[in-house]
Regions:
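Residues lining hydrophobic/aromatic ligand-binding pockets adjacent to catalytic sites
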Residues: 1-148
Length: 148
């Protein structure tokens, strides 16, 4: 089992001069980041899906073995609350499947208000595993009912 270490993104202007050299262009931040870390979360996919050309540019900026961990769209987790999300999952994975060799786990962060419901969760996981078995997933439950 490989251990990958990274952060929840690489595009932080506060890092310039601290992590990133002062003279480096923002367009080169990911390439520089990938010399120090070997994975990163893609947080923007939670808010809106990146364009395919953007994802391709990211893929070209990192070495083989680097892993991107895209965060599942909030439309799936927070708006639809895991129900009736097949079309939304298709849109999400269509963006990232071209770089599947660079994908780490997909982060599924649930809203703090989403209580555990066995039927909803089972149907969601079943649809993921049936249609997208090649991916790995990390589920972040944030409501106390998930503990039981």
């Amino acid at each position: 089992m490989a251990l990958h270490i990274g952060t929840s993104g690489w595009s932080y202007k506060e890092w310039k001069g601290f992590f990133y050299p002062p003279v480096i262009k923002t367009t080169d931040w990911l390439s520089y980041y990938a010399t120090v870390f070997d994975c990163t979360e893609i947080n923007m996919s939670f808010y809106h899906l990146p364009k395919q050309q953007t994802v391709d540019k990211w893929a070209n900026a990192v070495p083989a073995g680097f892993k991107f961990c895209p965060k599942m769209s909030r439309y799936v987790t927070h708006i639809k609350r895991l129900k009736d999300v097949e079309d939304s999952l298709d849109k999400f994975f269509n963006v990232f499947d071209p770089i599947s060799d660079l994908l780490g786990p997909v982060l599924i962060q649930l809203p703090p208000s989403l209580k555990y419901d066995h039927d909803i969760v089972a149907a969601f996981i079943q649809s993921l595993l049936k249609k997208y078995p090649m991916h790995r997933y990390a589920l972040e439950a944030r409501h106390a009912s998930w503990i039981n």
